[in-house]
Amino acid sequence: MHSLARGHVVVTGGAGLIGSAVIWALNVRGIDDILVVDRLDTSEKWKNLVPLRYRDYLDADEFENRILTRASSFANISTVFHLGACSSTTEADAAYLMRNNYEYTKHLAHWAVDHGIRFVYASSAATYGGLERDLRDDADLDTLRPLNMYAYSKHRFDLYARDHGLLSRIAGLKYFNVFGPNEHHKAEMRSLVDKAFHQIRETGAIQLFKSHRTEYKDGEQQRDFIYVKDAVEVTLHIAEHDANGLFNIGSGTAHTWLDLVRPIFRAMNVPERIEFIDMPATLRDKYQYCTCASIDRLRASGYDAPVTPLADAVDDYVRNYLIPDRRLDPAQAPAGVK
């Protein structure tokens, strides 16, 4: 079993949603010997770092340069959580995505494996492309067809890791629909919970896409939602148990958009008002009506903790973070829903 308390921990993308939540969970465990790696641009994601405890910060490009030219300067690093990437599914600059999401990950993975460092990286559920329902992390990677350049950049590294003998020595995590505190900087890429909260506060209502398939009623399109607090507990489990290969990080259950938004109204103590609008014609042929992670491999790795019920997770997020405008703070709450 790998000890996260032994040696330094590196978290790339450490100011982002999942990265900052990983640091929070480590802090709750009493671990703060952490190097945060990120690109603090003009967004407000730096605010996610304010309550957290960590040893040092490095710009992502400087970190890459050092591991390529002065790897010896990083003595005693035992664990790397590589969670930094451009995660915009609408990013059109393919060269940027391949450089940032593919080449960068290759450099980090080889460096970590060569130096005996535990390496856990973020793949993505987007790599499954247009597949629906029971999405399996043991599927033949050659059969997957990503639908956007972001997903392809992630899938390309999964293929590289497999073909170069890395995937049996590292862990790739296919995060599904992660939501929770510390995501507001993501703008249009943030979860519907965050978007709906602000929409309800401003207008008293939330808009959802109508269904354009007869087997699904409006609002009953389904997704596998997972609370960020659960996602990071799974992430730490994978790192500690030396479980290698690809793992789906989801709840294993599909819920409807209505299941997601109704608890928001209750937590805000406002009447439920849901309006259904036409889906843009450009999305209709690409829209997935049901995604659900198979988590058999995760359970086989020994992770047996229950997933926070969706309504409880939404309630915790809205009441304890969105309404008071708080971020994850190890001084205020232990890991888990409180």
Label the model's feature ranges:
Residues 9-29:
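N-terminal Rossmann NAD(P)H-binding glycine-rich loop of SDR-like oxidoreductase domains
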Residues 12, 37, 80-84, 119-125, ...:
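SDR active-site strand-loop-helix element
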Residues 35-63:
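Glycine-rich phosphate-binding loop and adjoining beta1-alpha1-beta2 segment
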Residues 51, 60-100, 129:
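NAD(P)H-binding glycine-rich loop region in Rossmannoid oxidoreductase-like domains
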Residues 81-84, 94-102, 106, 110, ...:
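Catalytic Tyr-X3-Lys loop
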Residues 99, 103-107, 114, 118, ...:
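Catalytic helix-loop patch of NAD(P)-dependent Rossmann-fold dehydrogenases
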Residues 147, 176-190, 197, 210-228:
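Glycine-rich "substrate-gating" loop/helix at the edge of Rossmann-like oxidoreductase active sites
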Residues 200-338:
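C-terminal substrate-binding subdomain of Rossmann-fold SDR/epimerase-dehydratase oxidoreductases
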